[in-house]
Design a protein with these regions (language model features):
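Outer-membrane beta-barrel proteins and related beta-barrel translocases across Gram-negative bacteria
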Residues: 1-306
Length: 306
């Protein structure tokens, strides 16, 4: 704690062993001390006790208060925070908000340091007018791939009288085919789905990808070897409709397959051939009072020489 330039006071320090100590009736602040008896730090932590554990580099505070100009702004019966800059599993500071529709929102996030390249955050939220909501976020970073996923779930929305959920997941990486002539194949996934058309309006803080009205879900494979490259993808949209402001659904690509051959600097010329075949699909019945007689499906194929 002193490495950060902080200082404090205590009524008693009990050294349990070389790695652990208990500091009772303790205060801590990083505000510079000004000489004189009337000095008051801008902010100060007060606790009934700080339990210092240098073995796992953590401090556990009991009956903690954070005071700003001697006015308490945050209190917790117990709170654990790290002594160093390394990531540690534990509860994060609670979040409190007020929404004119959902009411008072109180969130308690728990950070789980699974491994140096993986972590997760589990958050429990109580909304005074809607009820209980659970949020989970998982992140990973591997040598050949990386990604993240987030899932929100409200078992019973008291205002909508239904269960609500939202899913957002992204993955990018390469997979080994096991065939030396093929090598690695790139894999990309982007999935965004919600339970109902009102999700974007009711949960504006659920994440940018889940608060839009056009939610893409796509999966693609891409491969290249020398001058030849190929790509195959499926792209589908979930359109969140509003009867007062309807959206015409975009065409899905189910699937799109593309091949490209490049040849550079052939006697001073560059040449490329691109072949593409795509099947388009769209359901215009999703539009409230939607138009009829419009071609819903189509397909195109072409080859271009450049």
């Amino acid at each position: 704690m002193l490495k950060s330039g902080g200082h404090g006071s205590a009524s008693e320090i009990e050294f349990i062993d070389s790695q652990r100590a208990i500091i009772r009736n303790a205060t801590y602040t990083t505000c510079s001390r000004v000489p004189g008896p009337s000095w008051l730090p801008e902010w100060i932590l007060k606790a009934a006790s700080f339990q210092v554990n240098e073995e796992d580099n953590t401090i556990q505070a009991k009956d903690l208060q954070l005071r700003f100009h001697d006015v308490p702004i945050l209190a917790a019966p117990t709170l654990t925070f790290p002594l160093d800059t390394q990531r540690h599993s534990g509860f994060l500071a609670p979040l409190i908000g007020i929404d004119s529709v959902s009411g008072i929102e109180v969130s308690s996030p728990y950070y789980w340091n699974i491994a140096p390249h993986r972590d997760a955050t589990l958050t429990t939220t109580v909304m005074s007018k809607r009820g209980l909501a659970l949020d989970s976020e998982f992140r990973y970073l591997e040598p050949l791939h990386q990604g993240q996923g987030r899932f929100n779930w409200m078992p019973n929305d008291s205002l909508r009288k239904e269960s609500r959920w939202g899913l957002s997941a992204q993955h990018s990486g390469e997979a080994d085919t096991g065939v030396s002539a093929l090598g690695l194949v790139g894999v990309d996934l982007n999935i965004n789905r919600v339970s109902d058309d009102n999700y974007w309006r009711d949960f504006p803080r659920a994440g940018l990808s889940l608060t839009q009205r056009l939610l893409p879900a796509s999966g693609s494979l891409h491969w290249s070897q020398g001058d030849l490259s190929m790509m195959a993808q499926v792209l589908q949209f979930q359109t969140l409709q509003d009867i007062s402001s309807p959206i015409t659904p975009p065409y899905n690509r189910s699937p799109q397959i593309q091949a490209r051959y490049n040849k550079w600097n052939v006697q001073g010329f560059d040449a490329a051939i691109t072949a593409d075949t795509t099947r388009f699909e769209a359901d215009f019945n999703q539009v409230p009072g939607g138009a009829t007689g419009i071609l819903r499906n189509g397909q195109r194929s072409f080859a271009a020489l450049q």
